[in-house]
């Protein structure tokens, strides 16, 4: 009879630690190129902790300017030019603000949190009038809204405010003071078909001490009863912004015109504050 042949699998040996690629041995300019392909949050949270050399690269300007230079669109080129012009002087003990900027991506997106009430009243400072604020589904779709829900007011003025800290969102003072950015604000308001309503919007640009730098207000005519569940949009762009802006205060009011108990007042949703690079 034939003999049995053992076919036991031989385990693959572990690689020699010395054979593992050590990126720290790369020349700084080549390591910089490699790191520029790593996501910004990973650079800040992990790569920066590897060693002093990596920390110096992540804290420096060159890495982040390399990331920005990869966007060849007109907006990308405009941003790169603006960033180069208004970066603060490099300091060994202070990380380049472009790191937080690239990680948080504050330009071109809505900086208002919970704009449609999808999280209830979270992030808003509210003053309840009548029966107070509630959140309901939209009676008609609102274009571009992240959620088809809205904040609904009552028979007495209901107020709601959110203050956006622009530096906390990833912008830096020299960029805000450069004259190269503008602030676009927008709000949608409407009524239910069987009740008229009133609406107010107040947007204020504030400095670090909460002093007013610029402001905009909208006091449109009331929407009448039997209005086909209409929604209207209010927009404004702050351009040529004066130096010192650090906060945007966004506040709107609403109430009904029938003075009915319950929630028949102005319906507000899809509020937005967007910072963008001036193209002209």
UniProtKB/Swiss-Prot annotation:
Coiled coil location? none
Boundaries of every F-box domain copy: 20-67
Nucleotide-binding as UniProt keyword? no
Checking InterPro entries in the record gives:
F-box-assoc_dom, F-box-like_dom_sf, F-box_dom, F-box_only, Galactose-bd-like_sf
Positions of the FBA domain = 101-277
List UniProt keywords, sorted A-Z: Ubl conjugation pathway
Regions crossing the membrane: none
Q: Subunit details for this protein?
A: Part of a SCF (SKP1-cullin-F-box) protein ligase complex. Interacts with SKP1 and CUL1.
Described by its record, this protein's role is as follows: Substrate-recognition component of the SCF (SKP1-CUL1-F-box protein)-type E3 ubiquitin ligase complex. Able to recognize and bind complex-type oligosaccharides.
For this entry, the protein name equals F-box only protein 27
Its source organism is: Mus musculus (Mouse)
């Amino acid at each position: 009879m034939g003999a049995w042949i053992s076919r036991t699998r031989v385990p693959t040996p572990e690689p020699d630690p010395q054979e593992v690629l050590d990126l720290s041995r790369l020349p700084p300019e080549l390591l910089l190129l490699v790191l520029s392909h790593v996501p910004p949050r990973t650079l800040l949270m992990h790569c920066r902790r590897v060693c002093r050399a990596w920390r110096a690269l992540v804290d420096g300007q060159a890495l982040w300017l390399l990331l920005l230079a990869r966007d060849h669109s007109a907006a990308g080129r405009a941003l790169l030019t603006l960033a180069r012009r208004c970066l603060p002087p490099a300091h060994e003990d202070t990380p380049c603000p472009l790191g937080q900027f690239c990680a948080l991506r504050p330009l071109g997106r809505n900086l208002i949190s919970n704009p449609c009430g999808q999280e209830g009243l979270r992030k808003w400072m509210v003053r309840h009038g009548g029966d107070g604020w509630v959140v309901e589904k939209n009676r008609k779709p609102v274009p571009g809204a992240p959620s088809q829900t809205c904040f609904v007011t009552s028979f007495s003025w209901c107020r709601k405010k959110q203050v956006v800290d622009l530096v906390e969102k990833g912008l830096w003072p020299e960029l805000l003071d450069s004259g190269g950015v503008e602030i676009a604000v927008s709000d949608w308001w409407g009524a239910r078909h069987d009740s008229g309503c009133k609406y107010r919007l107040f947007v204020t640009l504030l400095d670090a001490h909460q002093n007013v730098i610029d402001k905009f207000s909208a006091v449109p005519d009331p929407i009448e009863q039997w209005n086909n569940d209409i929604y209207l949009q209010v927009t404004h762009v702050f351009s040529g912004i004066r130096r010192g802006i650090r906060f945007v205060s966004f506040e709107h009011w609403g109430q009904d015109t029938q003075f009915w108990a319950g929630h028949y007042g102005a319906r507000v949703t899809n509020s937005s504050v967007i910072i963008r690079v001036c193209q002209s």
